[in-house]
Structures are given as C-alpha cells and as structure tokens.
Amino acid sequence: MVSSMKVEWYLDFVDLNYEPGRDELIVEYYFEPNGVSPEEAAGRIASESSIGTWTTLWKLPEMAKRSMAKVFYLEKHGEGYIAKIAYPLTLFEEGSLVQLFSAIAGNVFGMKALKNLRLLDFHPPYEYLRHFKGPQFGVKGIREFMGIKDRPLTATVPKPKMGWSVEEYAEIAYELWSGGIDLLKDDENFTSFPFNRFEERVKKLYRVRDRVEAETGETKEYLINITGPVNVMEKRAELVANEGGQYVMIDIVVAGWSALQYMREVTEDLGLAIHAHRAMHAAFTRNPKHGITMFALAKAARMIGVDQIHTGTAVGKMAGDYEEIKKINDFLLSKWEHIRPVFPVASGGLHPGLMPELIRLFGKDLVIQAGGGVMGHPDGPRAGAKALRDAIDAAIEGLDLEEKAKSSPELKKALDKWGYLKPK
C-alpha cells in the first residue's frame, strides 16, 4: 500500500543522484513548464510515459515499483529545460517501435503542465536493440547491387509529380535513366490512379529499365511508391519482386511504425530494399520547441530497417540546417551494434551547381535526388540527368564546374540557367 495522504506524486519520479543501469533506455526531452516547477514538470513526463497516473494510488504492484522511470538529469536550456529520463526495460515490449513510441511520445505531448515538449533523442541499450534487424542491405549492400563503388548515387523524380500517364512516365524514365540517373523515384503522393495504375506502371517501367541497362551497361533501379493500406503494400511489393525490381519506396511517417515493421519482414522475404520517404515529418519535427526531432525519427527508422532515408540538404529548398543534417547523416553511417548503416538521401531544390558544396558538406555516401534541377534543364530530362552526373563527377574529381562545363554542354546550360542558386 501507498501510505500517504499526498494527492500528487510526480516528484517520486525525480532523482538527480540516480545512476542509470546499463539495461535502461534513456530518453532526452526539451520541455517548458506551464504553471509548475521544472522538477514537477519533468516528473510528470516520467510518470505519464512509464507507470503513472495523476494521483497517488491505494496499491502499487512490485513490478510497477521497479518500472518507475527516473529523471536523473535536469538543466536549464534557453527558455526551457533539458531532462534525461531512465526507463527500465520492463516498460517496453521487445521488438515493438509502436509500443515504445506510445510510451515515450504518446500522452506526454498532451499534458497541460507543459507549454512545449520535444523528444530530442532516445538511447536503446543492446538488450532492447537486439530485437530489431535494421536494414537488410544498407550502404554496402546497395552499392554492391547497384555496382557503384565510390560516388554518390543519383536519383530523380519526374516533375510535375502528378499527371503522367503510364506511357508518358515510361518515356521520361527512359530519358532520365539514359542520361545517367541511377534511381528513378515516384513522389510521395504518386501511387495508383485511373490515369496511371500501379499494376500497369510497374510492368512498363521495369521493361524500360531492362532496356536502358542493356544499352548503357549500368544498373538502374526504380523507387516505386507502394504506400497504402498494409495488405495493398504487401501485394505491390510482390509485384515489384516478380518484375525483377530491387527497391520499394514507402512513406514511412504516414504509413506508421507498425506498417513499416511488417513491410520490413515482407521485403526481406522478397529481397527488396526500402527507400524511406519522410512525407509529413515536418508536422512534428520542424518546431524546435515541440514534437520529435528528425534525428529520433531517423534512428527509429534505422532500427526497423530502412535502407535509405531522406534527411535534407542544407543547400536546397527544405528546412533543416547543416548541423542538424550532419548529425543525422553521421549517425546513419556510423557503426551501431549489428544494425547496418543507412544511405542518407539529399533532396529538395537541388541542381548541378550545388553538387560541389553538397558533397563537400556530406561526403560521397549519399543519394542525391534532384527533381526540378534535372527536369527543368533547357534541353530536357536526358540533358538534365547528364548535367547532374557530370557535376557530381567534377566534384568527386576536385574539378571546378566551369572547367568541367567546357567539355559538357549539358552542364554548361544548367549553370547558365541556375548558376549556384540556393532555392528558398
């Protein structure tokens, strides 16, 4: 029994002298209290995300007592505070990102005692991490099946992102692949429509891919968007595998962790890599005071097992500064127990003139996706694709783009149009 007449017990979850055990999961939060002390606010986070309710209870089971989260670090940070909380693994189901996020990123975001709350990072111990497979291929595996050893992979999306018939899409794909693009990608909302059915597109595009591979001697792939209800995604993945595809693309945020974990199993059986699009992430990653960081999102996606994921560019049109993106990319490429490294994808407002700076900032282990910066070339998509490849080759070789453009009319026209513009 809890022999106390006190109503609230949030401070029972705060112990700044506590030393976390090696098998506890650590979560870092930024928060701003609303009418309560920082200690109480931190305790409320720990309580709500572990075993708590708003009041003291008549009885606590022994397991509940041992499962209480503990705030062990609390420091002022700007207008708010940083808290680090240790969670016993008894709180978490093995191998379930869904259950983990329901705890550490669930009801805590709705508490009135907090003006803002942001999940900055989480640190799973090996005892928890070992239940996750991570990527099936990762950077090394993708480089092997693509046959690309020492340069960034190139990707593009036919623009406009919607409105293409299957025949029109196939014609554009032929031009893009022939010009030097490695990966043709559907955009996030391009799935299956009366004017372009998935089943027709998948068959047509892989026939075009096979033709281009025979003509160029290069491996080409199609990041086809299979996103939909889980049963539909599974059927679409099977179609891709039957047509000889190597990749599927999933909008992982809108699909959700449960769907992604299921499709990780499906794609392993089918031998398919997962390209993770992050559409909708900014709804909770963009506000620096509230939500979940892109870093935490990328970490969770790596645990489940995506092979490549969009992270930003720092030089293009999408929000995200260099330090944030570099931190994410470095983590995705780092050694992490048995979990393979993941290819970061740079996309959004890229064109050939930005390649030297992009590669200088983030290195060669990168998928570079340029949509408008390829499709908007004055001489068409094939020329745009070649201009991008030539710009990347120049950057890898340490050549000035203006010098490279002397032997590449496609690159010269791209530079004449966009120069070194950074879109806003």
Swiss-Prot record:
GO terms for biological process: AMP catabolic process; carbon fixation. GO terms for molecular function: magnesium ion binding; oxidoreductase activity; ribulose-bisphosphate carboxylase activity. SUPFAM superfamilies: RuBisCo, C-terminal domain, RuBisCO, large subunit, small (N-terminal) domain. The keyword Magnesium applies. CDD domains: RuBisCO_large_III. Belongs to the RuBisCO large chain family. Type III subfamily. It comes from the Archaea. Substrate binds at residues 161, 278, 310, 347-349, 369-372. It comes from Pyrococcus abyssi (strain GE5 / Orsay). The modification N6-carboxylysine is found at residue 185. This is Ribulose bisphosphate carboxylase. Because the Archaea possessing a type III RuBisCO are all anaerobic, it is most likely that only the carboxylase activity of RuBisCO, and not the competitive oxygenase activity (by which RuBP reacts with O(2) to form one molecule of 3-phosphoglycerate and one molecule of 2-phosphoglycolate), is biologically relevant in these strains. The lineage of its organism: Archaea, Methanobacteriati, Methanobacteriota, Thermococci, Thermococcales.
